[in-house]
Amino acid sequence: MVSGFVSDKNKTKAVQYKLSGHNSSALSSETVPAGQTECRENYGQMPHAMLKNTAQAEKYRAKPLTSQQTQTTMNTEANRKTEWVVGIGEALWDILPEGRKIGGAPANFAYHMSQFGLRSCAVSAVGDDEAGRELRNQLREKGVGHMLETVPFPTGTVEVTLDGAGIPSYEIRQGVAWDNIPFTPQIEELARHTRAACFGSLAQRSPVSHRTIGRFLETMPDGEGQYKVFDINLRQHFYTQQVVEESLRKCNILKINDEELAVVGSMFGLEGMQPGEQCRTLLDRYGLRIVILTCGAAGSSVFAPDTRSYIPTPRVEVADTVGAGDSFTASFLAALLSGLGIGEAHRLAVDVAAHVCSQHGAMPRLPERFTARLRNDGPAIR
């Protein structure tokens, strides 16, 4: 899914969001028995394929851990104190012209976090269907930790159509699994050990997932080193002022693009202000640590109480822009977690997002020149 980072601002107008004719009133909180959900090992049922700080995990890093290996590793006292980076919300299939690829902003975020060597996890829900089973398999193959609950709804899909410049339009199916993410004891335990989480507005279109995301954020520990990133991702009519305001009060970092900022500005009486002034107002009003504003070809800015960073958008040959914004968010946060400053984090995020725009799909493998920038400093929760 695109989250607002495109290489040509004038082309952002071409991005359209269409709905299929599914009835959203059919959403339900009913779930299948817990035993049918993946990752039911001891100690909080933490996800497998994510363990990176023990000798045993290092041995198996090149391939997914089995349930027995996960259970053994998770039972150590060191791992009971492990901190995770979590993307919570939609995990789905983007149906692209060249075939289907894993998508959903939180899943994309978790994938890119894992490329920087952090213990990341995608929290979502899938159906008891072929698409859900294959989504799990693909995440395993990509080395992405995941806690995907099985629910009696179809696995989410999005029909993606690309124009001649690689700018996508979407048909987002409703009444799907990620609309119904339950807040299980396993997800609650994961939240207690999460240092940074990224969430958006799209998965909050349904009351079930809205409640789960809210409870997850409330369960996370508080502290100066905790990050709750609201990557707003406004999609068609799948948001309300109430959801946006609640999310602004729960996060400490906001990521937004220029078109979304215009919508939010209208919501909260910020019309007539310059974009920078709008960002500063949101920063102050909601006590945020950072506001990230992306403006397509016009560049991007990062605002903090005593800092502003601006970087122009690099020129690249665009393959498609799917997932570029998610890679921006992940790279920026990974850099902060590794101890880099805002300017350095911003530079990495811009470079990674530009690279993702030059590739097909939301989850390309990042070159060593990007991932090595953080390995030299050592991410704090690797």
Please describe what each predicted stretch is.
Residues 189-190, 246-247, 284:
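Structural alpha-helical scaffold elements that stabilize or flank donor/cofactor-binding regions
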